[in-house]
Regions:
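Generic hydrophobic alpha-helical membrane-span motif
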Residues: 37, 147-150, 279-282, 376, ...
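Short beta-alpha connecting loops at secondary-structure transitions
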Residues: 170, 296-297, 343, 387-395
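Short, basic, helix/turn surface patches
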Residues: 123, 127, 346-357, 396-403, ...
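Adenosyl-5′-phosphate
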Residues: 1-4, 22, 172, 202-208, ...
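Short low-complexity, flexible loop/linker segments enriched in glycine and/or proline
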Residues: 336-340, 383-385, 564-566
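Active-site adenylate/phosphate-handling loop in enzymes that bind or generate adenylated species
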Residues: 142, 355-414, 486, 491, ...
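Cysteine-centered catalytic environments shared across enzyme families
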Residues: 1-341, 353, 357, 543, ...
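Flexible, active-site-proximal loop/turn residues at the rims of small-molecule/cofactor binding pockets
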Residues: 11, 373, 619
Length: 623
């Protein structure tokens, strides 16, 4: 994995190199092996920090020109089908100097131009400069695994565009201003993350997944276009038997894993107690690898520890498994961890994911993960909530309101499976329409709570993704929306930032676009049937995995944050959440009330207090 950056515009060569060097220095963790800058005549420059994965030779460094010297590439990611593309390009007369997928990518661009994107299987964010036509292209992979930020330049009669893999790099450019977006802040308070459509600083943009940006230096205009549509697959349902679908799923996942185990450095996999990572590891085991190395961590708090199941899976599959219980010095770790994120972020699973990456990096440079399985096959409990929501609509609204009031008498629990929290969240959602209810399942501060906290709060900007699949089954709608929001802006951001903080490349076989398309096209009953989730994934791996794993419901990879906030994290959290930095915006008495309720076990405010804590720590690093 790597960091890419570039400046396109009429600046002096010296200025370009100085500014770009500063941007790259802020992203060294993404590519610690080498740093290079390529001057694009007097039109700008490309930069690259390299984490060597395939072809470790110096000749494979970037930025890289194609053989004709017309196109220059700066590339972050992996092209898993580069070998078959290379064979095709050789037949068309292309010559190669390296064994890297980067060279295959730039030669593919030289041959097919923008149409080459549709031939790629992989995760990527890359930039191409066309020397002849003075055009810049920025491209991001279909599912949004790799990040890319950009901003227009309009300063001192200079027009142009600057881009970088991470916002922490982009803001090192002196003409990029750090003006906080209140709509992005509002979205963060609601969901623990900012959206693709609205970066935390005004004037900075995130290139959406499955899109490319075309910038014309002659006109100083750019446009962003989509090159792949996930919604089309949800509309194009397959007429296929369950047995045939099971066989096809096994084939596609095997193909994906086979493409992703290629590396010239040590490779392993994350292994939790769930079926997703177990399925990936089972295919690695069948790939005839000499040895499969897997890694897990757990907490001392019993309900947050899945190590016994991961160890059972590892023993069943015969892999070399390493696991440990972690005792994180959370008050010292969290500020450093939050600073590794470009924007405010408060998913509590960031802590165990960070610790897992730290553990795995001691042994490998590349790790496969099971991320994406829940979105593809309906693994989240929120989809069961969607089903029950349909039933609840048959009850009078007065009955639903009464049930919500009664739920506040439930005793508060700080366990991982905190049913009192889930029941209260569900009953509030039962009063809403389906779209609003599905969104509310993951809300941290609902509108009423946000109003008490932030009297001058503003509505956040959110695209209504439901409209793309309005005529599909309601559970298909929910899964599509989650892939366009939760997966892109929470799960994949978390995995990218914490893995890159350790210079570890994480690959996600479930997000191979061919597998994603197939999952979207299959009947919803193959994914969720009655109270069973991931039906087809469980059936397709019944021969390979232990029964305990096949029966295991979704638990998640969360932290005991509610417990920590009442104990070892309290001092730091209270100081940060009641600091002037936050109380300038927010009502301090509302924050004090949340602390009183939480500390006295009157209400589990763990997620809301952690949201404010992470925001405050982010402000200390970036404002």
């Amino acid at each position: 994995m790597c960091a890419i950056a570039g400046i396109i515009g009429q600046l002096a060569e010296f200025q370009q190199k100085v500014h770009l060097a500063s941007i790259l220095a802020a992203m060294t963790h993404r590519g610690p092996d080498s740093t290079d800058i390529e001057i694009l005549e007097n039109h700008g420059c490309f930069g690259h920090n390299r984490l060597s994965i395939i072809d470790l030779n110096e000749r494979a460094k970037q930025p890289m020109w194609d053989y004709s010297q017309r196109f220059c590439l700066s590339f972050n990611g992996e092209i898993y089908n580069f070998q078959s593309l290379k064979k095709e390009l050789r037949q068309l007369g292309h010559q190669f100097r390296t064994q890297s997928d980067s060279e295959v990518l730039i030669e593919a661009w030289a041959e097919w131009g923008i149409a080459s994107i549709n031939r790629l299987v992989g995760m990527f964010a890359f930039a191409v400069w066309d020397r002849k036509d003075k055009q810049l292209y920025l491209v991001r992979d279909r599912m949004g695994e790799k990040p890319l930020y950009f901003s227009s330049i309009k300063q001192n009669f200079t027009n142009g565009l600057v881009f970088a893999s991470e916002l922490k790099g982009l803001i090192k450019y002196p003409f990029v201003k750090k003006s906080l977006s209140m709509t992005a802040l509002s979205h963060y308070l609601s969901f623990n993350y900012t959206s693709t459509d609205d970066a935390i600083f005004e004037g900075i943009h995130k290139l959406p997944p499955a899109a490319y940006l075309h910038y014309n230096l002659n006109t100083h205009q750019y446009c962003v276009k989509e090159y792949w549509s996930l919604a089309e697959s949800f509309h194009d349902k397959l007429a296929i038997s369950f047995d045939d679908a099971t066989a096809e799923l096994n084939y596609l996942l095997a193909e994906s894993v086979n493409g992703q185990v290629l590396a010239d450095v040590p490779l392993g996999a994350f292994l939790s107690g769930g079926i997703d990572s177990a399925a990936v590891v089972s295919h690695m085991r069948r790939n005839n690898l000499k040895q499969v190395n897997t890694y897990s961590i757990g907490f001392k708090e019993k309900t947050y520890n899945e190590l016994p199941l991961s160890q059972k899976t590892a023993q069943h599959l015969g892999v070399n498994h390493q696991a440990k219980i972690v005792f994180p010095p959370i008050s010292h770790l969290l500020p450093k961890l939050i600073s590794s994120f470009d924007e405010p972020f408060a998913d509590t699973s960031l802590i165990p994911t960070y610790l897992l990456c730290d553990f795995a990096k001691k042994h490998v440079t590349v790790s496969l993960s099971g991320d994406g399985g829940d979105e593809l096959f309906g693994g989240y409990i929120t989809y069961q909530a969607d089903r029950y929501h349909q039933f609840m609509q048959h009850l009078p609204i007065a009955t639903r309101k009464m049930l919500l009031k009664l739920s506040h008498y439930l005793p508060t629990s700080f366990n991982k499976i905190s049913w009192d929290y889930k029941i209260k969240q569900f009953l509030r959602g039962s009063l809403l329409d389906f779209k609003s209810a599905h969104t509310s399942w993951r809300e941290i501060f609902n509108p009423d709570q946000k109003k008490l906290l932030w009297p001058e709060w503003v509505e956040h900007n959110s695209k209504d993704w439901f409209n793309d699949v309005a005529d599909c089954h309601y559970l298909d709608q929910a899964m599509y929306v989650d892939m366009k929001t939760w997966l892109v802006d929470d799960i994949l951001v978390k995995v990218d930032r914490v893995s890159m903080a350790h210079s570890l490349e994480v690959r996600t076989p479930f997000l191979d676009h061919r597998l994603v398309q197939f999952a979207a096209r299959m009947p919803i009953s193959y994914k969720i049937h009655n109270r069973q989730s991931k039906c087809i994934l469980r059936a397709s791996h019944a021969r390979y995995l232990p029964p305990a794993v096949l029966r295991q419901p979704k638990k998640g990879f969360n932290s005991p944050i509610s417990y920590w906030l009442s104990n070892e994290l309290f001092e730091l959290a209270y100081e940060v959440t009641t600091s002037q930095q936050l109380t300038t915006w927010f009502n301090k008495s509302a924050i004090e009330k949340m602390w009183y309720e939480h500390r006295n076990s009157l209400y589990d405010n763990g997620h809301r207090l952690f949201n404010l804590l992470c925001l405050g720590l982010w402000c200390q690093s970036y404002l």
